């Protein structure tokens, strides 16, 4: 009699735990989606470096439109939603310093970017600058 009761309790617990496990969401996102508003024009016109705040000057290995496939994939993986896909996005960027010498320390694509808050991977709202 005790064995039957133990088996019944075990079966009940197994079913109850299975129901709780099935009710648990599988996709528990820890990184919420970030919407970024950029007011920089989507043009490729070059501006003088003096018209850009020093903290916004970046040296990027690549500068592409936000609508290009590689950039849209990276934005999607990072959970970044842009309101305007006509802006330029810099990839693998680092701040331009005067200490670097030469071209202001940039041998790639010098740009002025509005949003540099995603580390060195991506800068959003970029405009090419002449150093």
Curated annotation (Swiss-Prot):
Protein induction: A CT-rich motif, which is often found immediately upstream of the transcription start point of highly expressed filamentous fungal genes, is present at the expected position.
Glycosylation sites recorded in the entry for this protein: 53, 115
Record's keyword terms, sorted: Cell wall, Disulfide bond, Glycoprotein, Secreted, Signal
Main localization, broad class: secreted
Subcellular location(s) of the protein: Secreted; Secreted, Cell wall
Signal peptide: 1-23
Disulfide bond sites: 52-112, 59-106, 60-93, 113-126
One GO MF term: structural constituent of cell wall
Entries under InterPro entries matching the protein: Hydrophobin
One Pfam family, short name: Hydrophobin
GO CC terms in record: extracellular region; fungal-type cell wall
Oligomeric form and interacting partners: Self-assembles to form functional amyloid fibrils called rodlets. Self-assembly into fibrillar rodlets occurs spontaneously at hydrophobic:hydrophilic interfaces and the rodlets further associate laterally to form amphipathic monolayers.
Biological role stated in the UniProt entry: Aerial growth, conidiation, and dispersal of filamentous fungi in the environment rely upon a capability of their secreting small amphipathic proteins called hydrophobins (HPBs) with low sequence identity. Class I can self-assemble into an outermost layer of rodlet bundles on aerial cell surfaces, conferring cellular hydrophobicity that supports fungal growth, development and dispersal; whereas Class II form highly ordered films at water-air interfaces through intermolecular interactions but contribute nothing to the rodlet structure.
Protein family per UniProt: Belongs to the fungal hydrophobin family.
Name assigned to this protein: Class I hydrophobin 9
Organism taxonomic ancestry: Eukaryota, Fungi, Dikarya, Basidiomycota, Agaricomycotina
Gene name linked to the record: Hyd-9
